[in-house]
């Protein structure tokens, strides 16, 4: 087993293990294609893409598992619950940005206050839009009724 799991870059003081899963080409390719790591995206587009994905899947648990799951208004309540969670996540992202980046908006990358504000704005718009699209899909497809 020691030939498979070894210290990262053969340095035992790094604190990271190099395993066949973490160092495989498929894993690196998959992680490299995620919007947070993809090259050439502005922070606004990163936030928009991440927000759309999160907003789209947030409505499901509130709709299926919420306290009003057996009522006719379960989908609408699930949408508003997802909106509430998105607002909470937006506040958390805003607080993180205010606490972490003190550069007064210099720079356009994600590690600056302006970039983080753009990321948060994109996340909010994308998540609200993604939840709305999921609502429209679930509301208009008779398979889910």
Swiss-Prot record:
Report any one BP term from Gene Ontology.
Answer: photosynthesis
PANTHER family linked = PHOTOSYSTEM I REACTION CENTER SUBUNIT XI, CHLOROPLASTIC
User: Keywords in UniProt for this one?
Assistant: Chloroplast, Membrane, Photosynthesis, Photosystem I, Plastid, Thylakoid, Transmembrane, Transmembrane helix
Kindly give the membrane topology term recorded for this protein.
Multi-pass membrane protein
State the GO CC annotations: chloroplast thylakoid membrane; photosystem I reaction center
Q: What is this protein called?
A: Photosystem I reaction center subunit XI
Q: Where, by residue number, does the polypeptide cross the bilayer?
A: 48-68, 75-95, 125-145
Q: State its location(s).
A: Plastid, Chloroplast thylakoid membrane
- Pfam families for this protein: PsaL
Gene name in the database record:
psaL
What does the similarity note say? Belongs to the PsaL family.
